[in-house]
Every structure is written in C-alpha cells, then in structure tokens.
Amino acid sequence: MSKSPDPTRDELFAEPLKQPELFTFSEAVAGVFPDMINRSVPGYATVVAMTGVLAAQHARPDSTIYDLGCSWGASLLSAARKIDHPSCQLIGIDNSEAMLKRARLNFQEQLGDQRVVLRASDIMDIQLENASVVILNYTLQFVPIMHRETLLRRIRSAMLPGDVLILSEKLTLPDPQLNDYLIELHHNFKRQQGYSDLEIAQKRQALEDVLIPETRHQHVERLHQVGFSRCDIWFQCLNFASLIAIA
C-alpha cells in the first residue's frame, strides 16, 4: 500500500509546467512554506535561532519588536521565546493572509503570548514606532529596488541609537564566475534536500524578476546612507547571508 502524499512537503514545481507563473506567497505556497524554506535556504534554521538571540540582546523595555514579512512567524516566535521584557510588544506584518492564518495557529499552539500581534499589510504602508528590533529575514529581496531605501529609512527613523535591524537576504557576488559557482553550489544543496533538476529550474524561472538579490556592498552602503552607524554580515552560508545593522 503506497503512502499518501505529505501535504506539507513542497512539491509545487515537481510536475512540468507549460509556463511557471511568477512566484507569489499564495495559499499553495503558504501550505508548504516551512518545508520549502528549510530545503531551499542553507543556514535558515541557524538564522531563525540566532534572530531570537540578537533580538533579546537589543530589545528595550516598553519597545516594539517588528517582523516585516513574517510568513509563518518563525523569526518572531524565536524572538518572543528569548525576550524577557514582558512590556515589549511583538508585531508581525505580512501581506499574505494565507501566511498569517498559519502564523496565528503557530503562535497559539506554541506560545499563546498576548504580546504578539499579527497584521495583514504591505510593509511599505505601515507606520513603525519605538522599534528596538526590526527583523527583515528574506523579505527585502522581494521589495522593488527603487523602494528599498525608503523602507529602510523609515525603519531607521523609528529607532533610537543602539537599536538593531536584522536583515537576511540572498546575495549576488560582483565576481560573475564566483557568483555562478555559488549558484551551482546552491542548486547542489537543493538536490541534496530532495529537489529534482526540474523543480529547481521551474522555481528559478518563477522567481526571476520577483526576487532581486544585491551584493553585500550594496546592502551595507544603503544601510549607512539611511543612518545606521555600523553594519556587516554576521552569518553567511553560500549565497545567503544575514546582516546586523546598529542604529
């Protein structure tokens, strides 16, 4: 007797598609998102775990911790578990109601924390206030490049000196040959996670013109331009990195 397919396993690109649609955070994607991101982003679990550690280091009493593009809420949950200040409020923002539906269940089942608020909104439309910690894990890369500085400037304006932005992104490298080498290493990583060449190719096509990576230099330069005093990479695995920016 054959096993029933696992509905939480990412097989969205397993069958040939005439023309893969542009990638969106749809109901189908939301349903398999934890499996998708863990099998697609090397070092993801480490980034999530350390997000909690970094957030706890910088969270101020009576301040707000924001997770912009929170999806299922893994990073915000990590922060909530590590932050000791009961007066801190934690706010998760996502424009996908399908993601937020699962995030609400996630928090109810694992935390039941009344400090956590989840909101459906475009992160470009929100007003940030008294933000001691802002989490942008694998979110900025989906924001059009022309709007990224505006968002980061708004984040910095909501902070006091010493507050922190945690920014995780897929990177591109200025050396084309090294960039291609890391892309192929990433594809090999995904093969080791059980993805087929067809799945890798079709998802890459779906993400083209949707996920736009930048170089480390571009990120650091922009962060300085909007007013962060210090910033650099604290973790990297292949072409995925996490930066910390201190206000």
Name each region found by the language model.
Residues E149-P161:
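A short glycine-rich, Lys/Arg-flanked "PGG" loop and its adjoining helix->strand segment in the class I
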Residues K18-F23, V29-V47:
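Class I SAM-dependent methyltransferase Rossmann-like catalytic core
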Residues D209-V226:
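Short alpha-helix
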Residues I135:
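A conserved beta-strand element that flanks and buttresses the S-adenosyl-L-methionine
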Residues Y66, G73-M124:
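Class I SAM-dependent methyltransferase SAM/SAH-binding core
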Residues M1-L22:
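N-terminal auxiliary segments of SAM/dcSAM-dependent transferases
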Residues G43-P61:
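Conserved alpha-helix/loop element of class I SAM-dependent methyltransferases that forms part
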Residues I166-Q192:
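Conserved class I S-adenosyl-L-methionine
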